[in-house]
């Protein structure tokens, strides 16, 4: 109606409609089918935005979330505090769900989702690693894993065997390899250092030739120390924490020993320094600015370690090369 149109024009809701319109027209294939309005003051505010969006874009709104609904999560230097450390995570999710149940049009959201076209998915080709038992460091100190990487390993026939460098006294029996992912070892460095038997168990396994891939926090744990806290001591380097980001963004990792290059992502406040005559085995380049490069990462024995997070499906052969 004309009165509703005037209300759209005269209210700040028009700016919300402009934002939606901008996303719709920026790309012809945007595929935007509906709008969920966030941080509104109440039902009347939502109605203003809903009418403006409908008037200027023709899109339906599927409900709203009021700004008083507490969906905030605590954060630290690398982003959100992991779910493993949020003791009331489930009750908070349930309370948030209760609060938005009356303001979201769930049937409409599901209907719009059902109309979405099927996205093309490239066939996944995994190297076969049937029967390979891989120890997976997983606790509050080590929780940064791409779910797709774990799925890829299991798709290749790997049995993932979780263990805790914080709580367990030694590695699980009968392992063929180790995967030490990222996380917050610097937050738990005192406890990690105090678990001497686990540190010795890991070092003994690696010195005996067990294949291992250590990524970011996992690499830090294998170093001689994090700040003043003694770590596994397998890699000839020391780590220190800084008060600012050292690296952040997409990178290209060139393995100087094999000549292969892999896309990856770095995000860390830590800095490392090789000890003795040790040298780094990778050349890292900023993906958006290839002229920026720096050394990083090490091979030692059958262990490969570095700050970069890799997605195994970008180079499936990487999995087999790491642990065979």
Where does each model-flagged region fall?
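Internal gly/pro-rich beta-alpha loop/helix module
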Residues: 13-125
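Pocket-forming structural segment of enzyme catalytic cores
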Residues: 224-292
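A glycine-centered loop/beta-turn motif at secondary-structure junctions
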Residues: 295-322
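Structural motif
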Residues: 36, 179-181, 307
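Cysteine-nucleophile active-site neighborhood
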Residues: 185-255
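Beta-strand-turn-beta hairpins that frame and shape the catalytic cleft
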Residues: 129-132, 258-262, 299-304
């Amino acid at each position: 109606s004309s009165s509703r149109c005037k209300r759209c024009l005269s209210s700040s809701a028009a700016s919300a409609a402009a934002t939606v319109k901008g996303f719709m027209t920026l790309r012809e294939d945007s595929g935007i089918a509906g709008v969920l309005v966030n941080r509104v003051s109440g039902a009347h505010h939502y109605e203003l935005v809903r009418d403006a969006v409908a008037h200027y874009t023709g899109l339906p709104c599927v409900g709203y979330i009021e700004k008083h609904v507490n969906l905030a999560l605590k954060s630290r230097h690398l982003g959100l505090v992991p779910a493993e450390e949020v003791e009331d995570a489930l009750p908070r999710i349930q309370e948030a769900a209760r609060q938005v149940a009356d303001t979201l049009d769930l049937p409409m959201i599901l209907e719009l989702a059902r109309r979405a076209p099927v996205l093309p998915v490239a066939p996944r080709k995994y190297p076969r690693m049937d029967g390979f038992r891989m120890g997976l460091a997983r606790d509050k100190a080590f929780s940064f894993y791409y779910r797709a990487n774990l799925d890829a390993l299991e798709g290749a026939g790997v049995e993932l065997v979780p263990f805790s460098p914080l709580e367990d006294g030694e590695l699980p029996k009968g392992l063929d390899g180790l995967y030490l992912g990222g996380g917050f070892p610097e937050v738990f460095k005192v406890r990690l250092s105090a678990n001497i038997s686990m540190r010795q168990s890991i070092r003994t396994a690696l010195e005996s030739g067990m294949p291992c891939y250590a990524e970011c926090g996992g690499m830090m744990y294998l170093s001689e120390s994090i700040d003043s806290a003694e770590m596994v001591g397998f890699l000839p380097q020391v780590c220190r924490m800084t008060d600012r980001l050292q690296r952040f963004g997409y990178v290209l990792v060139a393995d100087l020993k094999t000549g292969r290059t892999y896309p990856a992502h770095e995000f860390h406040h830590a800095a490392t320094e090789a000890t003795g005559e040790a040298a780094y085995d990778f050349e890292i380049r900023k993906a958006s600015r290839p002229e920026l490069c720096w050394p990083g990462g090490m091979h030692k024995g059958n262990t490969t370690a570095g700050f970069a997070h890799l997605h195994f499906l970008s180079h499936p052969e990487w999995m087999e090369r790491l642990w065979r």
